Design a protein with these regions (language model features):
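Stable alpha-helical structural segments in soluble proteins, enriched in small hydrophobic residues
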Residues: 32, 140-152, 453-463
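Generic detection of short hydrophobic beta-strand segments and adjacent strand-loop junctions
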Residues: 4-8, 208-215, 279-284, 415
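Acidic carboxylate diad motif detector
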Residues: 62-231, 374, 378
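Short amphipathic alpha-helical segments
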Residues: 17, 21, 133, 137-144, ...
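N-terminal cap/recognition module
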Residues: 4-107
């Protein structure tokens, strides 16, 4: 899949359409959530103990199911009548395959409302939010709510079996507090059209088309869907196409491997087993961007809340929205530049697989100093890994993510053991080398190496999908090349 993003401001002719649909999507999702939660709590109580809202919701649900079942019976009988009047072998076959579909009423033990039940209840009862929304956009909002609940049920079952995987017990899906939620159009309600060498989207019930740019950009792709999400005072239109590309699979016997260590001072550190010098991409632009963002945001919030209670005052402004948009776009730009440099380097050196180090929940309870903590947790490393995966799929280079605990502390040259952090019964490991200053690691024999390159080498070693014996013989990973991307 490939997604194009477009920012839409208040000057756009479709601003009202996007405002209405994102606000209604939020209402629809909250309404579906409200029905599910009240049916859950209401059926667990006796009729005398139920609250007014629980009684009202249960009445709406039972009435809606009754009406939907009655309509289903009428449609079934009408279809049978038409088929019998038509006669013939084909009608007889269709008639034998025709089935009456009816909804079951929720019970104390089986209380969950599926998408089909919610959609039928809102449709036959004429719910105002459901009826005023664009076709299929309302149904997609219900689907997202039901999907959130199913994910919750799955997480609860997994939590019961493996509580150590979670920070806390999963909670039931909550209500959306923002003014809007992501609205989702299918390729039937937001249709793609080409005219005069350009591509346009035509939304249902809207006369004004939305221009996507040159038609040549989308040649050979299959249009899938369009999503519109609130984005710091603007709207971001995400148009998804099927480019028929899948992530490349790891070869059975890879020979050339590239280890990547993601960090802060050095955003990327890469080292391979094929003799080329390792390189590091400086993280200065990312740190400077975050520092500027935090400083400017503090100034704007201070001016906005001056003379009022900071906890309960209004903290939204056009300047804050513009600042957040600028920071997000700049961060995305830096990450994609890093990803493209890394993947072009990999293609140039015929790399068989890229191994990226990561730590699960690495930002939880981190303690690397007050200033480093602030800088580290502000960088969306998950987004950087996703950018690398996206570019790798385009260039068909396999990418593997490897758990990297202790890779920065262990000595690559001394073959130190690197267990998984947090394992039960783990004895704290002792390492042969140590970091003697910022960015420099010294092994047992006194040999010095760039600390981040040592981490990248250990990530390759921990992945253990190819032999690194040649690196120990050659010793050509001492001095990395520094790359500046801004």
């Amino acid at each position: 899949m490939r997604t194009w993003g477009f920012n839409v401001n208040k000057n756009s002719a479709l601003w009202k359409c996007f405002s209405r649909n994102t606000a209604d999507t939020r209402c629809m999702r909250n309404t579906a959530n409200f029905y599910i939660r009240n049916v859950m709590t209401g059926l667990r109580k006796s009729p005398e103990e139920r609250t007014h809202t629980e009684t009202e919701v249960l009445h709406e649900v039972f009435t809606g199911i009754q009406k939907a079942n009655t309509l289903a019976v009428e449609r079934y009988r009408e279809n049978l009548r038409k088929l019998r009047l038509a006669g013939g072998m084909k009608s007889a076959v269709v008639c034998s395959c025709l089935k009456l579909k009816q909804f079951s009423y929720p019970t104390r033990t089986n209380w969950f409302l599926s998408y089909e039940v919610l959609d039928a209840v809102f449709k036959v009862t004429g719910h105002p939010v459901y009826c005023r929304m664009d076709s299929q956009v309302n149904q997609n909002a219900i689907r997202k709510t039901v999907k959130a609940w199913k994910s919750y049920f799955k997480a609860v079952r997994d939590y019961a079996a493996h509580p150590e995987k979670y920070q806390a017990k999963p909670r039931i899906p909550g209500y959306i507090r923002t003014t809007g939620a992501t609205a989702w159009w299918t390729n039937q309600t937001a249709k793609l059209r080409f005219r005069d060498g350009k591509a346009y989207l035509r939304f249902v019930n809207e006369k004004q088309p939305f221009c996507l740019g040159k038609a040549s950009l989308f040649e050979g792709f299959t249009y899938v869907k369009t999503e519109v999400q609130p984005f710091h005072g603007h709207f971001r239109v995400l148009v998804t196409f099927d480019d028929r590309l899948k992530e490349a699979s790891v070869p059975e016997h890879p020979e050339r491997i590239l280890g990547v260590d993601i960090g802060l001072t050095n955003l990327l550190s890469a080292a391979g087993n094929f003799g080329d010098a390792p390189f590091v991409v400086g993280g200065g632009p990312v740190k400077a961007l975050n520092q500027w963002f935090n400083k400017r945001k503090a100034e704007l919030l201070s001016a906005l809340t001056r003379g009022s209670d900071s906890k309960h005052s209004h903290k939204e402004s056009h300047a804050l929205d513009a600042l957040s948009r600028k920071r997000d776009d700049a961060m995305t730009d830096i990450f994609y530049k890093c990803a493209w440099y890394l993947l072009r380097y990999a293609k140039k050196n015929q790399v068989d697989v890229i191994v990226i180090g990561y730590n699960k929940a690495q930002k939880q309870d981190i303690s690397i100093g007050k200033q480093n903590n602030q800088a580290f947790v502000s960088v969306p490393y998950g987004k950087l890994r996703q950018c690398i995966r996206t570019v790798a799929a385009k260039l068909q280079v396999p990418v593997v993510e490897q758990e990297e605990s202790y890779t920065s502390m262990a000595s690559f040259w001394d073959l130190d053991e690197m267990p998984v952090y947090g394992e039960a019964g783990l004895v704290p490991p002792v390492f042969s080398g140590r970091r003697i200053c910022r960015g420099l690691y010294q092994d047992r024999s006194g040999r010095r190496i760039n600390a981040d390159v040592n981490g990248a080498l250990n990530i390759m070693r921990k992945c253990n999908i190819v032999s690194l014996r040649a690196l120990y013989d050659r010793g050509d990973v001492d001095t990395p090349v520094r790359i500046r991307i801004a």
